[in-house]
Amino acid sequence: MDNKYIVKSSKIITVSDIKTLYNGAIVVSDGIIIDIGKYDEIESKYKDLKVIDFKDLVITPSLIDCHTHLFEYAPSTVYPVTEKTYEIAQDALILNGLMSGVTAFGEQVCGSPMYEMNLDKIKEKAKTLPLDIVFSTNSITIGFENLVNLTSVTGKSSVDKSTLINEEILEKIIDESEYPGENVFINATPANLKEELVPKAGEIIYTQEELNKISKMFHNKGKKIGCHVAGEEGIKMAIEAKIDIIHHGHGITNELIKKAKEENIIIVVTPLGGTHLKPNSPEEIEALVKEGIIIAIATDSYLPPDINLPWLNFEDDSPKGPEVLMKISNQGMLKLKDAGLDENEILSLITLNGAKVLGLEEKIGSLKVGMKANFIASKGVPGLEITDTNDIIKVFYEGKCVIDKK
């Protein structure tokens, strides 16, 4: 494909101040959007450029999944791999994400008993892939009968609680973290395990004093901090500790929603699961948005869904990943539409708001001049009108078509 060209469509949802363009066009040059507007105006300004006409396919920003575990935990969850084949599985999962319309991931690095992750090597590999991956380095506690603590610094080796609050370890975690993901697990997590295997999932791991200290260490280094948390007690602690981004927030109350808004906390909701409590419902998503909180929807890939939850509607509990981002967003997005929100605001939950979580909102997540030409052409509005990834026909990253389903 030429380095400079025009794409046109009967409908372009920009997720920007431009809102929705009908019979619109985008001018791409060297992977960047250099102009956008009505097709007639664009065509008259750039008469010599090739035009790619998507006709009735809807053009939107490509999707962003700002909370995943694709490199450490997902490969052995999805495939019967060993360490020898772990990296092949990683590649397969990334390709599946691209085929699902996702061109940016927020990836957690927690330490894992299954795989010794070389973060520098993975970061170098990520630079060669046609997508953006931002890494959050974390510590984690898994809720087995005997709690298991791990950190991104210590890798495969389990550690005791004192290591989680060790300043030297924390300094390394902070230095390596690229965005506020699950830097600290306030509750023990069930991870992606069956409930009976993790009886202590949900247990509070830190004192308020310890959490305050960790948060302050991040802020003193000029970095934001994110946390894994669910339940009223844990969420209160997160707010008290000045955590910047709450991941999950399952079980949040109306009172805590108001407090989170007062503190300008962003919440990454995970309707698929990820904690010891029931995941975010469509009603919860609506309440958060109505309060004015910036929320992003993410998959926490890969997780077995609760098949009894009506807003998920899965036939089995096999692990799900980026391919269900639209599906798990659908019911909440429909509620927001019924509440009168514009489709651009609604679509921001799986595009621009994820970019804000990753700190990339000046580069990706919307379609306007100066942004990367990361977009998809689909048979409807992702998450709102379509939930099947087969309806995403083409995926572009930095102006190049990386997935083409014709």
What are these regions (language model features)?
Residues 1-45, 381-383, 400:
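N-terminal metal-binding scaffold of metallo-dependent hydrolase/deaminase domains
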Residues 14, 356, 369-406:
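C-terminal cap of metal-dependent C-N hydrolases
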Residues 41-60:
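Active-site metal-binding motif and surrounding structural segment of the metallo-beta-lactamase
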Residues 54-120:
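Metal-associated gating/positioning segment near the N- to mid-region
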Residues 90-145, 181-191, 224, 265-268:
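Divalent metal-dependent hydrolysis catalytic cores, especially in the metallo-beta-lactamase
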Residues 149-209:
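Active-site gating/metal-coordination segments in enzymes
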Residues 187-296, 303-304:
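Active-site core of metal-dependent hydrolases
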Residues 220, 286-378:
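His/Asp/Glu-enriched, well-ordered alpha-helical/loop segment
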